[in-house]
């Protein structure tokens, strides 16, 4: 049996607490990672796997569903802590909750505002899938408490506030009784156990939450896992020894690195981790070489495995007459006027192209910034008429004068809020352009998974020049690179075939065969 221990953590200091955000504020980082890719591989081969979840994830079922791994069996540390036994999901409606008779409900496009006696009483916030995610309660316009809902239909935890600052968080069982209380003020942070449930814990007080998490995870592993099991541990950015020390003596461990998560890792701190693991996987060739150079004694156990996202379909853009270009802009970098102009100029010169400018998880002002820049460049250097796709009559107008015509243009700006929205956008895309100093990782993974050629300024493991993409020496070469893939089918088909061959090397059967071979070699070396 393979057990996967993911790193689905929060972005703050309390990494064990998964970020709880409303649907209109999407995460500023990828959800897709190495663990998700690996589990899908095992599912494709109908091999049994189990997830061991360390993080507090009250919306875990929706997360697993979004990533197409909902059927995966799992053990959750916080389900153990909170005595949650059922995995049946239940969608709560606003009417299912108890409210005072004088509550007034105001429905907005984003959330439900609740008022009592003319005063703000609560904000009801929703997740991406439309379920009640959390409710903020206010007193005298100050945040008083935050109820976080489990996607199985109960209040999972309550965060209490004083003067707008977090004081403590109670983690509840499905009956609403608090099981543990986490004190959140920096100078007094610790965890206490409700004495009523003392028999379920080794101690009544813990110095920090990770101590309790490791206690529960260690107990589960020691009582439920066979000694010769295989553990795939997603490498944490800082240390992995706490988890690795819990693994049975005769089990086999695989340590998996993912660039998006581990780019801040201090190489020097990884020595003990690499010595312990039987096999080490990385998603980037350059990081593999770095580890091998830094730890030559462990070099033979370090291997490169490229992730793909099997939710994408190959080659669907051939069904479109127009060539759709997806141009990724990274708002963490300064807008490159010249790059945007060159892309717009190419589209203006080629009437059979359409342009989608994709911005990842942008706030409204970020979208506006891109819109203003596009309008400015077209106004100063191009002709808006060159971008007209079609015009049609405005049904509200009384006469067919030109000024009453609605115009549709061959470019639009799209805010990419998550991986699924990018997948939908790439479904019929012909060419990806990303001229950032650090190309978006998931866009590159999605591009090769869908067989779409990509134009970049920077070389990477995912794009090979003139095979499945074009690496520019300078932005001035953009038109040459775009023509290479859009003028005729030969080069585009070659990129598709290259992607197919690369994906074939990473099908479930091939990957698992390699894993077993690498593991055997590593174990034999011991």
From Swiss-Prot:
GO terms for biological process: protein transport. Part of the accessory SecA2/SecY2 protein translocation apparatus required to export cell wall protein GspB. Keywords: Coiled coil, Protein transport, Translocation, Transport. Residues 359-386 form a coiled coil. InterPro entries: Accessory_SS_Asp1. This is Accessory Sec system protein Asp1. The keyword Glycoprotein does not apply. Belongs to the accessory Sec system protein Asp1 family. It comes from Streptococcus gordonii. It holds the Pfam family Asp1. The keyword Disulfide bond does not apply. Part of the accessory SecA2/SecY2 system specifically required to export GspB, a serine-rich repeat cell wall protein encoded upstream in the same operon. Transmembrane segments: none annotated. Disruption phenotype: Loss of export of cell wall protein GspB, the protein accumulates intracellularly in protoplasts.
């Amino acid at each position: 049996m393979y057990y996967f221990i993911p790193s689905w953590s929060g972005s703050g200091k309390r990494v064990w607490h998964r970020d709880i955000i409303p649907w209109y504020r999407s995460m500023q980082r990828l959800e897709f990672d190495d663990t998700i890719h690996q589990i899908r591989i095992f599912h494709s081969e109908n091999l049994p796997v189990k997830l061991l979840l360390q993080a507090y994830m009250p919306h875990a079922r929706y997360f697993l569903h979004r990533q197409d791994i909902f059927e995966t069996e799992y053990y959750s540390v916080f389900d153990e802590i909170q005595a949650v036994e059922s995995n049946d999901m239940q969608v709560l409606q606003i009417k299912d909750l108890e409210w005072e008779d004088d509550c007034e409900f105001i429905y907005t496009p984003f959330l439900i505002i609740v008022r009592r006696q003319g005063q703000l009483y609560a904000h009801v916030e929703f997740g991406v899938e439309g379920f009640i995610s959390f409710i903020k309660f206010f007193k005298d316009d100050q945040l008083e408490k935050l109820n976080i809902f489990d996607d199985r239909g109960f209040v999972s935890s309550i965060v209490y506030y004083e003067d707008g600052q977090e004081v403590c968080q109670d983690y509840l069982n499905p009956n609403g009784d608090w099981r543990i209380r986490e004190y959140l003020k920096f100078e007094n942070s610790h965890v206490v156990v409700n004495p009523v449930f003392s028999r379920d814990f080794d101690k009544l007080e813990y110095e920090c939450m990770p101590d309790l998490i490791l206690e529960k995870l260690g107990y589960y592993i020691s009582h439920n896992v066979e000694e010769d099991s295989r553990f795939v541990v997603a490498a944490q950015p800082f240390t992995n020894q706490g988890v690795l020390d819990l693994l049975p003596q005769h089990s086999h461990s695989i340590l998996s690195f993912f660039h998006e998560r581990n780019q801040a890792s201090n190489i020097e701190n990884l020595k003990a981790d690499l010595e312990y693991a039987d096999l080490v996987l990385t998603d980037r060739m350059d990081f593999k070489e770095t580890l091998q150079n830094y730890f030559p004694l462990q070099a033979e156990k370090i291997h490169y495995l490229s992730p793909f996202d099997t939710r994408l379909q190959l080659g669907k853009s051939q069904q479109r007459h127009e060539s759709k270009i997806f141009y990724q802009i990274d708002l963490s970098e300064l807008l490159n006027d010249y790059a945007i102009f060159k892309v717009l100029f190419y589209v203006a010169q080629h009437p059979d192209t359409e342009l989608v400018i994709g911005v990842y998880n942008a706030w409204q002002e970020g979208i506006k910034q891109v819109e203003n820049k596009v309008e400015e460049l077209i106004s100063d250097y191009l002709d808006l008429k060159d971008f007209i796709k079609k015009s049609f009559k405005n049904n509200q107008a009384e006469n067919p004068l030109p000024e009453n015509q609605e115009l549709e243009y061959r470019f639009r700006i799209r805010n990419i809020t998550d991986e699924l929205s990018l997948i939908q956008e790439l479904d019929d895309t012909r060419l990806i352009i990303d001229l950032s100093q650090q190309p978006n990782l998931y866009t590159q993974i999605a591009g090769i998974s869908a067989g779409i050629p990509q134009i970049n300024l920077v070389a990477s493991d995912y794009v090979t020049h003139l095979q499945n993409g074009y690496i520019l020496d300078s932005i001035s070469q953009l038109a040459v690179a775009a023509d290479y893939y859009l003028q005729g089918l030969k080069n585009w088909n070659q990129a598709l075939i290259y992607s197919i061959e690369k994906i074939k090397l990473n099908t479930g059967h091939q990957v698992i065969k390699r894993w077993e071979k690498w593991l055997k070699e590593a174990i034999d070396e011991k």
